[in-house]
């Protein structure tokens, strides 16, 4: 409706006349009442179009111009409005005024000569071509403004705005103005036109004037008053709109808003517009270098800009822009200033870093000092104009600091802070040094003492003032590391000083509790032992590590590694000797790989042909860019036959590929491996025990999806797991038809064999007397690792110009041509460390020893004593004491050790020499007496060595089951890491076909009868000991029964054993003249003949101290020859006695028997047997019966005497004959122990659990039964149950998973043992191997809270099945430990019983041996803190020392008794009642 009216009806137009006080200055004062400003603001409201100055004093020309047009009124134009009633209208505005002549200051004469009051009330205005008025500047320049004429030159006035100025006008009286307005109102009232009174200049209004104006309006009828301010644009439109509404009665009336309320609304509108404009400016203007012209052009189209300019004008908008730019500039300057000030400390640090240089200087002097520094211009810049913030430098990319900045207060404050920092740093360093000194001097700070215990002894208020707690802890941690490392070094030195004790105890890889207790007792009073009392685990680890070094001495296990003497000597000799690497190049074993291929039905030959096809023409194979000679030995028949033997005199295997394509061929592989390993037990070199195996499934068709193939794969994996070998499914790799294996797999296998070959040191053989063809004498020079002497000085005395590398010796061997006696002789000098010399002492022929020791080091002399204890007195010894200077300057310790060394030399009738270091070296002639003595005893030494080797080679080799360290714990070490015993003679490679062996084994029968294969580990002593499953012994030949327990096989697990060393002290030497070949009985299996033809002749030593031998003959068989050798008459005791009395050559003894200073710990050798209860299994602890020993015929006697051509040497050899005690052959356990096949036990966890039932049924039943009936059983899990009952329980459960344990009436210990057996038989331990290392690292964290949290996080990484079962078992053990007052099973005791079962570490590595203590404490921690780890509870409070519960977590299980923590997991589980699981 409204829109239609807008379209149909013309917009109404009204003419309004604005009137008010006008006239000369006398009448109106110096300024008008604001009529022009009111009209200007209404017609042109924009701030830029509003002008405050509108003069009424005009020149005649201006008055006559077209704008004024000789009239006393101005036409302001028209303005369109949209009032509240939404009806548009137009208003023509006319201002009635009175122009004054600028010459006469009188009103201009116009066409209307009426006075202003009459003229202003006129309703008809006419002025032809009169132009619209803008401002005063328009007059005379009309062409520069818009020219718009008054419509039709005439207007009819519709209403009047009566203006009253309520400001304090100059030279104007308000009352006079009010009288004038009153008259004017009276005149206008006559016109009957609407009228509104407008109060102008209210922004400067006077309250009285406003009040009077309102009073005036009240006296008039219907005279409305509007308060306005044209300058502030307040109520201007309201005044005109109100008048229009009076003119047009149809329009609604607007509310008259008081001035101050309207001003508030206008101010809010302006403020909002200003905020928006400022936001626009901040968004557009980002740089202080912006100009208004550019910015104004970019903002023209923005509504925010337009609104603000309309309200406030461009000038104010520009002003705000400049304010913003100035603010940006200041911010930029402040940023630069801040950067300069932040860089100033660094500048000071680079130019004046020392406090002493500036400590007492003022800032001004320091500023001058900086200018004199050479690096000044790199940091500062001197500007030509200052200050820098008013120069262009503020926009420069130069980062240097303006030099005039240093004159500011801020720079002085920075300097003061820098100076204070230096002073504080100096003070903190002083406090740190003081704190460190306090730690060093404090007697309360011992290795391993926690910070919480130490702080009360060392802290003071001054320390707390200057240093923070983390700083103390860091210093304390570093100090602890230093003193711990020092204590460990000193403790290691202590262990070396007690070398005699370790060698006398004959320790092996798993020492007994008894022997460990001896070590504790002997070392317990030493201060260096007590220093590690808070680090018992580390101390135990050091002892175990040292035992490992004694048991397996190499360069890697040497405590001085990498500064081992062997390494140093090799480097020195390589640089001195000519062609040092030639002999390595000539060694045929260095680049040779011997590979056995085992497989029946042609599999071995086919694979050998395939591999040869991949080789070059000369059987060379390239691996990683290096050429290797590949020697293949395919075997398809009975491995007991010599033709199918794994090892021959010329072929020593480095690995074996086992091929199968059926159950029968797999059975053949297993049976062959078993036979080979059994036969190797009797060999001095039992490398076949640890021969690397690879089991390969051959399937030419590549079919792996069939049921048969899947079954073969599963069986192969089980066999590989039990044999601890690699399983390779060659068919699954996508081979082509007709091929068994690809080149990539061959390379992978050969790389593994090379690594095993290096680790097992299977290259090189022990030289015998025949190795001495290029030299006449072999001398061993023994040097102590870590002795403070220069090896170069020692070697300088050996005529280095004569060095030549030995062709058959070791890395430290050289040849010397020396004049000894009447001619020049060739001598091989082996320069070795003591630990390498121990092996040489037994395994190689040595004519003499040159033993060096440092006079000031006790450990050096102790090692010398330990070494000499086992040397025969027929071997000459040269003792050389190394000193650091003249004797007069030596310390007391060095003097004492020099004296002791000289006394030892006198007692053993050896040579003694003092060799000062760093001085002129003595000539080689000083060793001439020693070499002469060696030459004189050469014959007797070689004869003795020949007899030792022959006797050992002919003895029953099953002695391997006794302690491998009978004579010396170093006999099985590798020297240096590469030496082995000689290749066995051909007679060792002959096997006899026994009826009981040729018959298929039980395992073979089971393999043929069933599809499922289940094997027990063959050489895993740890697992077998935990399960306590000892197989029934096989009956060997001869018929005297012997048994061997599975734990004894641990001696065969390590690859470091090269044979059993016999103690020289246990050998009885018969007199020379009483010698008869028949007096010596040796096994007939050492003779080269088939075993099925040998005689069952054995001899048993009887009263060996008297040299008597009783011969036992086999009466069922005739002698192999017709001689009378070996008859009873030949063994007449009286003849032996007479022969002893007539003896010329006495038997050799050990030096320990000739010198009281040697063997001071020998009492432990007799009091502690090697096969003590802790070291042997329960079966071997039985009394070992003496085996029989048969005599040999003349043919056997001559077999080893015929090689000795020298009659003199032969006679001496006869004189050195001695009885050899034979240990009875012991059967090796069969691979097939199990008598029943389980479909539950021994399977992976994933196959016995489900998502609905994550705990195996068997575990649930056992735990429920134990918790219901056995929580108070004393020693539960420690006391083992009956083995047969445990097997019965497992067998019955296999048949019925719903077995009721209560109904069957099993004992608690039986159920507990079966529970542990379940975990022991798992293919992988419950705690995965890959998590065990991470758990050990987490346990090493010192902070308890962090340790627990780290271990808790690691639990989340467990496989789901393992985690759930581990949680279940640990929770059960935690509940068991809560009854420890009754069952005596604390969390510590439970952890000792369970950690080997749950973790099953590999005890063939030193890391596992030394980590056993940590493993146990980890399981103990899990049990003790079970609520925290699994049930989101807080950690359990640490128990007090007196509490019977678990010990503190920081050291969960410190030993409470003198013996150290045992290493072997099986030993740690031995109960008090009996030593079985």
UniProtKB/Swiss-Prot annotation:
CDD domains the record matches: pseudoGTPaseD_p190RhoGAP-A (cd22221), Ras_like_GTPase (cd00882), RhoGAP_p190 (cd04373)
Domain pG2 pseudoGTPase, first and last residues per copy: 778-940
Residues bound to GTP: 28, 33-37, 52, 56, 95-97, 201-203, 229-231
FF domain segment(s): 270-327, 428-482, 484-549
Residues covered by region (Disordered): 965-988, 1114-1133, 1166-1203, 1441-1467
Entry comment, domain topic: N-terminal part (1-266) has GTPase activity. Required for proper cellular localization.
Function noted in UniProt: Rho GTPase-activating protein (GAP). Binds several acidic phospholipids which inhibits the Rho GAP activity to promote the Rac GAP activity. This binding is inhibited by phosphorylation by PRKCA. Involved in cell differentiation as well as cell adhesion and migration. Transduces SRC-dependent signals from cell-surface adhesion molecules, such as laminin, to promote neurite outgrowth. Regulates axon outgrowth, guidance and fasciculation.
Protein name: Rho GTPase-activating protein 35
Record gene name: arhgap35
